[in-house]
UniProtKB/Swiss-Prot annotation:
<dbReference type="InterPro" id="IPR011768">
    <property type="entry name" value="Transl_elongation_fac_P"/>
</dbReference>
<keyword id="KW-0251">Elongation factor</keyword>
<dbReference type="GO" id="GO:0043043">
    <property type="term" value="P:peptide biosynthetic process"/>
</dbReference>
<comment type="function">
    <text>Involved in peptide bond synthesis. Stimulates efficient translation and peptide-bond synthesis on native or reconstituted 70S ribosomes in vitro. Probably functions indirectly by altering the affinity of the ribosome for aminoacyl-tRNA, thus increasing their reactivity as acceptors for peptidyl transferase.</text>
</comment>
<protein>
    <recommendedName>
        <fullName>Elongation factor P</fullName>
    </recommendedName>
</protein>
<dbReference type="Pfam" id="PF09285">
    <property type="entry name" value="Elong-fact-P_C"/>
</dbReference>
<keyword id="KW-0648">Protein biosynthesis</keyword>
<dbReference type="InterPro" id="IPR013185">
    <property type="entry name" value="Transl_elong_KOW-like"/>
</dbReference>
<dbReference type="InterPro" id="IPR012340">
    <property type="entry name" value="NA-bd_OB-fold"/>
</dbReference>
<dbReference type="InterPro" id="IPR014722">
    <property type="entry name" value="Rib_uL2_dom2"/>
</dbReference>
<keyword id="KW-0963">Cytoplasm</keyword>
<dbReference type="InterPro" id="IPR015365">
    <property type="entry name" value="Elong-fact-P_C"/>
</dbReference>
<dbReference type="Pfam" id="PF01132">
    <property type="entry name" value="EFP"/>
</dbReference>
<comment type="similarity">
    <text>Belongs to the elongation factor P family.</text>
</comment>
<dbReference type="InterPro" id="IPR008991">
    <property type="entry name" value="Translation_prot_SH3-like_sf"/>
</dbReference>
<dbReference type="InterPro" id="IPR001059">
    <property type="entry name" value="Transl_elong_P/YeiP_cen"/>
</dbReference>
<dbReference type="Pfam" id="PF08207">
    <property type="entry name" value="EFP_N"/>
</dbReference>
Length: 188
């Protein structure tokens, strides 16, 4: 499907020169003089190479047809990540480049959305929040409950984040999967 370059957004998949690219950033620039342009940074799905393209906002770009489906995460091995469609029980192998920064948040039997172009996985969407355990942080100091400063902590998945002073080792917390930021103490 052909669309104008100014309508391309982050997360879209573009087909260019027979290859698929996922859009990382898309910015429309309107200079004081001259023609408005769309600056698009994208990553080639096949090998992970990042490129930056500049189009006139009225240029036509081929947007790939993408289908989102629910999948369950099974396991990770040297070949990549393995997911199963819960309805058809078909298994799909997803390369590490496609999973990217989402890898630490994947847990066995976690439900995720996979974006597919034909039978090729091009993107993964995790649940917005994940519950993890704090495995290392500075000890709780009495009298720091009123302060709004955060302290560094290591989570059970190996990700570093900042937590409030009252959070100690062994506490289960909820974090945003997009950036690993602290949301709240888990209610379980």
């Amino acid at each position: 499907m052909r669309v104008i370059a100014s309508s391309i957004r982050k997360g879209n998949v573009i087909e260019q020169d027979g290859k698929l690219y996922v859009v990382l950033t898309a910015e429309n620039i309107h200079p004081g003089k001259g023609t408005p342009v769309s600056q698009i940074e994208m990553r080639r799905i096949s090998d992970g190479v990042k490129i930056s393209e500049r189009y006139k906002t009225t240029d036509q770009v081929e947007k790939a047809t993408i289908e989102d489906s629910n999948f369950t995460f099974l396991y990770e091995d040297a070949d990549g990540f393995h997911f199963m469609n819960p309805e058809s029980f078909d298994q799909v192998q997803v390369p590490k480049e496609v999973v990217g920064n989402a890898a630490p948040y994947l847990a066995e039997n976690m439900s995720v959305k996979l974006s597919m172009h034909d039978t090729t996985p091009v993107a993964i969407q995790l649940p917005q929040r994940a519950t993890l355990e704090v495995v290392d942080t500075e000890p709780v100091t009495k009298g720091q409950t009123a302060s709004s400063s955060y302290k560094p902590a290591m989570l059970s998945n190996g990700v570093r984040t900042a937590v409030p002073p009252h959070i100690g080792v062994g506490t289960r917390i909820v974090v945003m999967t997009e950036d690993g930021s602290y949301v709240e103490r888990a209610k379980d």
